[in-house]
Amino acid sequence: MRLFILAVLTVGVLGSNDDLWHQWKRMYNKEYNGADDQHRRNIWEKNVKHIQEHNLRHDLGLVTYTLGLNQFTDMTFEEFKAKYLTEMSRASDILSHGVPYEANNRAVPDKIDWRESGYVTEVKDQGNCGSCWAFSTTGTMEGQYMKNERTSISFSEQQLVDCSGPWGNNGCSGGLMENAYQYLKQFGLETESSYPYTAVEGQCRYNKQLGVAKVTGYYTVHSGSEVELKNLVGARRPAAVAVDVESDFMMYRSGIYQSQTCSPLRVNHAVLAVGYGTQGGTDYWIVKNSWGTYWGERGYIRMARNRGNMCGIASLASLPMVARFP
C-alpha cells in the first residue's frame, strides 16, 4: 500500500481522493471521532494538493526534492510545530562546557557514509513525544561506542527522557544534547533493551548495574561553519546536530532538500549527521531523523551542504567522547 501511495503522488494524479484518504488512514492507523474526521480530511487534502504541486515543479526541474504523504499529513504545520518542535536556545551556560572542534589540518574524505561501516543503528521513531534531542544524543553515542568497542549497541532514549531533567532537559517537551552529555558524565547509559522507549515521560528507573557507556567530554561546532562540521563528521563519526524545520521538511520524501525559508540562526529539531557527499554538483549532508522509516528516504534526509549553513545545521553540533561505564 505504501508503494501505491508513493506512486500516485509521484505521477501527480490522485484519481479518487476518497480511496487514497481511506488507504492513508489504514496505513497509519488513523481514527477520528465525528466531525474531526472531516476536519482532518480538509487539512489532509490541502497538504496533498501542496505535495502534488511541489512534485510537479520537481518533475519540471525547478526543485531538487520531492514531498510525500506520511504520518503527519493530517496536521497543519502550526499543529506539528507545537507538538514536535521546540526552539533550542544557544544561550545556555551548558554550551560553554564543550571543546570547540579543531581539525588541525587533518584530512577528511570528500564523501563519507557511516551507515556503510556499521556506525549507525536502525532508524527509530520518537512517536508523540518531543524527544528528538534524546535520539540525537543516543545516535552519536552509538557511533562513538562502535568506534571504541567495535560493537553496535542501540542505546536508551527513554533513560534520557526520564532521568536528565535536573540537568536542564524537559523530557517530551524538549531538551539539549549537551545537557544529556552532562548527565552522562555522572551516570551510565543503558541499552534500549534494558530501558525501552515508551514515548511518555515517566519516573527515572535507572539501574547503575546496567549502565554501559559514559561521556568524558565533548566536541562542539557552534560557529555555523560547515567546513568545521565536515571535519568533525569526516574524522570522528556521526555528530549530533540541530536544524530549523519548516513545512516542507515535515513532508519531505526524497532528493536533496534545499530551503529558502529555514533560518541559519535558529534551530528547533535535533537530528544526526551520519555523512556527506555530492550529487550532480550539489553538496549534501546525510541526516538521520527519528520519525520512523515512512518519512523521507527510509528515515533519512539529504540536506544541501555549503549553502550558508542552511537551516542552521552547523550552529549546534556536538560529538561526545565516550568510554565504558563505570
UniProtKB/Swiss-Prot annotation:
The keyword Hydrolase applies. SUPFAM superfamilies: Cysteine proteinases. The active site is at C132, H269, N289. Disulfide bonds join C129-C172, C163-C204, C262-C311. The modification 3-hydroxyproline is found at P109, P196. Residues 16-106 form a propeptide. Strongly inhibited by Antipain, E64 and Leupeptin, and weakly inhibited by iodoacetic acid (IAA) and phenylmethylsulfonyl fluoride (PMSF). Requires the presence of dithiothreitol (DTT) for activity. SMART domains: Inhibitor_I29, Pept_C1. GO terms for cellular component: extracellular region. Residues 1-15 form the signal peptide. Belongs to the peptidase C1 family. This is Cathepsin L-like proteinase. It comes from Fasciola hepatica. The lineage of its organism: Eukaryota, Metazoa, Spiralia, Lophotrochozoa, Platyhelminthes.
